[in-house]
Amino acid sequence: MADQKILWGIAPIGWRNDDIPEIGAGNTLSHLLSDIVVARFQGTEVGGFFPDAKTLNKELELRNLKIAGQWFSSYLIRDPFESVSKEFHAHCAYLEEVGASVAVVSEQTYSIQQSEQNIFTEKPMFTDSEWLTLCEGLNELGKIAQQYGLTLVYHHHMGTGVQTLAEVDRLMENTDPTLVSLLYDTGHIYVSDNDYMLLLTKHLDRIKHVHFKDVRSDILAKCQEQGQSFLQSFLAGMFTVPGDGCIDFTKVYDVLLTHDYRGWIVVEAEQDPAKAHPLEYALKARQYIDEKLLTTDEMKERI
């Protein structure tokens, strides 16, 4: 597994959701990890309900699974750097212990992703001084991540101050490329900008982690028309797994391969598990990846 250029994972968000803890609350860690094995993925990202590192490592070892990384909500604009740094050190120490490769960071100051606000029209905007604070802080967090053998990857996200291509551009232009890399999420940039290729091609050199998230365009249109919140939109089924929506992942994957991308591609599709059976959708994603994306040689490597 370690010799493969690309590792395929699937995020726990299809089973349980940290933003709405009651969603899928009956899905245990053992259930999640065993489903991932059945669907033939190589690993996952850490969810909020995951246990201590020793317990998690035992469960992973039993199933030959790996951890890619974990989300970290930064408040560099709102909070003193010392408090953010302390939390991030603990976050990275845990990730190092479970063998992760990336620390996924998203600035949550002013975020509306957990509020009832219209996710499509009411996103926050940072001032020039706030941008400076954010970028300087991210550079410092990047140094911390490296102390633990991790790469900091920034997650552009709906409902935050770094959502659009223009905002990602500004973040990339004002952070050190040796310290701050990019997580490319197909679904978030498509919902934000109605395009998913430009961000990919423009920032290929900074992309060190990838989320494959598909979008149901009909449900997206309804959610936009109704002015839904982020939580309402994903519960309505705006997001789904690759092959079940409107994004052409063959184009995305071809660009990544051409650029010799190395790292994780994680299927991440937050849905209501009561409506979208997690294992069923994991298997759908696996089938799409096998039939539409992987070459014969890549398939042989996986056997």
Swiss-Prot record:
Instruction: Give the EC class as a word.
Output: lyase
The record's EC number reads 4.2.1.44
The UniProt GO MF terms for this protein read: manganese ion binding; myo-inosose-2 dehydratase activity
Matching PANTHER family, A to Z?
HYDROXYPYRUVATE ISOMERASE, INOSOSE DEHYDRATASE
Q: Note the Pfam families from the entry.
A: AP_endonuc_2
Q: Tell me which UniProt keywords the record has, alphabetically.
A: Cobalt, Lyase, Manganese
Is Transmembrane helix among the key words of this record? no
| Name of the gene this protein is made from | iolE
The record, for SUPFAM superfamilies, names: Xylose isomerase-like
Q: What is this protein's record name? A: Inosose dehydratase
Q: Which reaction does it catalyse?
A: scyllo-inosose = 3D-3,5/4-trihydroxycyclohexane-1,2-dione + H2O
Pathway participation: Polyol metabolism; myo-inositol degradation into acetyl-CoA; acetyl-CoA from myo-inositol: step 2/7
Q: Keyword S-adenosyl-L-methionine, does the record have it?
A: no
Q: Which Gene3D superfamilies match?
A: Divalent-metal-dependent TIM barrel enzymes
| Top-level lineage group | Bacteria
Record family assignment: Belongs to the IolE/MocC family.
Q: Which GO terms describe its biological process?
A: inositol catabolic process
Q: Which residues form a coiled coil?
A: none
**Cofactor(s) for this UniProt protein:** glutathione; Co(2+); Mn(2+)
